[in-house]
Every structure is written in C-alpha cells, then in structure tokens.
Amino acid sequence: MGFVKVLKTKAYFKRFQTKYRRRREGLTDYYARKRLIIQDKDKYNTPKYRLVARATNTRIIAQIVYATLKCDRVLCAADSYELKRFGVSTGLASYAAAYATGLLLARRLLKQIGLDTVYAGQTKVDGAYFNVDEDQKEKKPFKAILDAGLVRTTTGNRVFGVLKGACDGGINIPHSESRFPGYVRASDEGESSKYKPEDHKARIFGKHIDAYMKHLKGQSNEAFQKQFSKWSKTLEAAKVDSVEKLFTKVHAEIRKNPERVKSTKKNDKPKRDHKKFYPTKLTAAQRKDRVKTKFQLALSQ
C-alpha cells in the first residue's frame, strides 16, 4: 500500500475540541487531578489533602492543598528559599534541599494543627522506608496524597525527596520505596529488586556533593573555585567542613523552630496621600448649595 497523506478537512476543524488552557500550557494534568480530588459520595466537607511538590531551576516549592468548588486553597506552604535562615544559601534546588523543604513543611503543618508533639516522625534519618502508623496514637495522623504534576516520576526525582522529608516529618503519605534513590529494579538475569537505604541517606545529606567537591579539588583548584565557590562560602559561614554536617544541623534547626519568619524589610517609599488626588464626595445638601451659587452667579452677570 502506498503512502497516503492525511488531509485535515473542514469537517476535522469543525469537530476539533481544544484541551483546557492549563493543560495546553502544561500546567495541570486534569486526568490525574480528577482522581486526586474527588471524594467518596458519602463524605461531606471532607477534602482530600494533596502534597503539591514542584521543582524549578532555582528552588523547591512544597504545599499542602485542598480543592473546593470555587478554587484550590493552600493550608500550608514551604519554600527552599527559607533554608537560607538555617544556613543553606546555595544548592536550593538539590535533592538534599528538597528533603529539607519537605521536612520543614511537615513540621510547620503539624505545629499549625497542634499535632507536632503527637507525631515527631523519623527523628533519626537513615533513608529507610518510614510512614506514620495510623493506629499507634489516639489522634489520627494528618494524611495527604502526593501531587507530582506533569513531571516525569523517574527514580530519584526531587519530588520524591519532598515526599520523603514530609513522611519523616510526621505526615502520613501512602508510598513505596520504588522511586527513591538506591532502589534497583529486578534484572532479566533473575536478580530480584532491592532497596539500599544507605544510598538514599547519602542523597538526603548531600554526600555526593561532598565527594565531587573533594574529587574536583584534587584535580584542579581553578575548576573547584569555578564550580563550588558558593558552596565553600556557605560551609564557611555555617562553620562546618562538609555538606553532610550542614544538613544535619539544618534538620535539627527545622525541628526546633519550623515557623515562618516575617520579612523585616522596611518600605522606604512614603505612603501616597490619596486625598490629595481624589476630591471628597459632596453630600446632597452641598450639591444643592453649589447649584444655587452657580445659578445666582449666572444671573448677576
């Protein structure tokens, strides 16, 4: 059979249905969203909470969101930019920063709803699978579902770093270790799949950054300064000699005080005097008097 060119006819364009704007722009996966937010029909005003994790080129954003008929509402949020006050001023889009952001979100949320003392989470980070047990306390743990958006959920993605941090922080999120760094899938030779928690722990504490810093410093000091000058300044400011010790310190500080600090920036610009530009509204009596005055002035002329 020869090649047949597909012609888009008038009927094709007449029946063509465009996708939703946010799907066309690559912002919302409505197929997944429908399954994430729809609740059982016998439950009323009981929203499903989503852990929305997004990674950009420069930062990690984590939010706890629930849907209403009108819009989505954010219950709690954390940003990797907030790690600057804990001593991390660079590498804010790394896997280690993603874990710390998830931990910050979890501790902040639980403190907000009064469950921070009930559910401490995994205080000793070892990279092993951990999820809050629903039956171990009187109060049920806060439950959320991971919303990864349109990102490819490959093994080791930073989205799962946020997930691991939130789980270790005390939020109950259904998951498995099959997408964490350190998970090896079953091979065709007959080897079964296995999970290495120590590899995941190394990523959480940024040991891979330490290893490459050491390697590059031994190769070329010029290349090291070009690649890791900001990291050197960060470690020097935090008074530690490795990225692992830095994030160990950060995790402890987050658990101590996860609350958001208000900005202390002062607005140097003076407030605009709007009364100067907009005249005050006259009352009915004042308007009548003004008309009378204008009428008498016209008669006198």
UniProtKB/Swiss-Prot annotation:
Biased composition (Basic and acidic residues): 257-271
GO CC aspect terms: cytosolic large ribosomal subunit; nucleus
GO BP terms: ribosomal large subunit assembly; translation
Primary location group: cytoplasm
CDD domains: Ribosomal_L18_L5e
Location relative to the cell: Cytoplasm; Nucleus
Keyword Ribosomal protein in record: yes
InterPro entries: Rbsml_uL18_euk, Ribosomal_uL18_C_euk
Protein's UniProt keywords contain Ribonucleoprotein: yes
Molecular function via GO: 5S rRNA binding; structural constituent of ribosome
Keywords, ordered alphabetically: Cytoplasm, Nucleus, Ribonucleoprotein, Ribosomal protein, RNA-binding, rRNA-binding
Pfam families reported for this sequence: Ribosomal_L18_c, Ribosomal_L5e
Domain of life of the source: Eukaryota
Location of region: Disordered: 257-283
PANTHER family the record matches: LARGE RIBOSOMAL SUBUNIT PROTEIN UL18 (PTHR23410:SF12), RIBOSOMAL PROTEIN L5-RELATED (PTHR23410)
Family in the record: Belongs to the universal ribosomal protein uL18 family.
Subunit structure comment from the entry: Component of the large ribosomal subunit (LSU).
Reported function: Component of the ribosome, a large ribonucleoprotein complex responsible for the synthesis of proteins in the cell. The small ribosomal subunit (SSU) binds messenger RNAs (mRNAs) and translates the encoded message by selecting cognate aminoacyl-transfer RNA (tRNA) molecules. The large subunit (LSU) contains the ribosomal catalytic site termed the peptidyl transferase center (PTC), which catalyzes the formation of peptide bonds, thereby polymerizing the amino acids delivered by tRNAs into a polypeptide chain.
Name under which the protein is recorded: Large ribosomal subunit protein uL18
Organism, as annotated: Tetrahymena thermophila (strain SB210)
